[in-house]
Amino acid sequence: MALNLEKKQEIIKAFATKENDTGSCEVQVALLNERIKLLTEHLKANPKDHSSRLGLLKLVAQRRNLLKYIKRTNHARYVVLIEKLGIKDR
């Protein structure tokens, strides 16, 4: 259920703004987005797993806050990021 190392490195490489960039907002949002996708699939198969549902809600809130920060500071980066991730603009 968790992201493996290869998948994480692939996401970091795709969304990094410079070399060795693992903590920028874009990378964090991309990693959260992948974890949210995995948890969503898990919850479809296990609808009574309420602790995972709470974890999913926390991840979604964290992603929302990071996206809000990116939108506030650099709108152009925000637009590119949501297009790459396939997230709807709110």
Curated annotation (Swiss-Prot):
GO terms for molecular function: rRNA binding; structural constituent of ribosome. GO terms for biological process: translation. The keyword Acetylation does not apply. Gene3D superfamilies: 6.10.250.3130, S15/NS1, RNA-binding (1.10.287.10). InterPro entries: Ribosomal_uS15 (IPR000589), Ribosomal_uS15_bac-type (IPR005290), uS15_NS1_RNA-bd_sf (IPR009068). One of the primary rRNA binding proteins, it binds directly to 16S rRNA where it helps nucleate assembly of the platform of the 30S subunit by binding and bridging several RNA helices of the 16S rRNA. Belongs to the universal ribosomal protein uS15 family. This is Small ribosomal subunit protein uS15. The gene is rpsO.
